[in-house]
């Protein structure tokens, strides 16, 4: 963000691009400002057996961040609130980010804010958050969208029958195929007579589904 510093003249949000979220940003910014924070980090609780897959955020009773644990083992984790990769900053944050050199938000900036005891807060929020850092996570995200579990994210395409959505120019005789939704079929895909598709399933474009 150093390269775009001149554009940030008010509260701004930085987020990782490998997650599917439906966060209420207006509410998040409101909480950030109420705390008088120079930086805030959106957190989410996970089950105890999941903490080893994420960065754990340790904060006091007021939400002030005191420490981080990067993918700790279950027995060593100091909490179950994790870093979602969604951050809110005030422009003054650049006073603590050196220009012209590599400086990582998580590895360099956040420990510096904690060490200097600056107003750096964890903001627990109730929202849908699906990490898509691995292939199984990507499939999980697709499945959740197809099953309507992700608020404000609709299945694209045309619904040709309940729970079955298609892109453009899908070739199929719908009376001779067995499809149980939720299913999305990409454009230009051909489905042969007698084929069976059971959801939740997403089929990419230009595929051929045989009997």
Model-derived features: positions:
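Unchanged
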Residues: 1-146
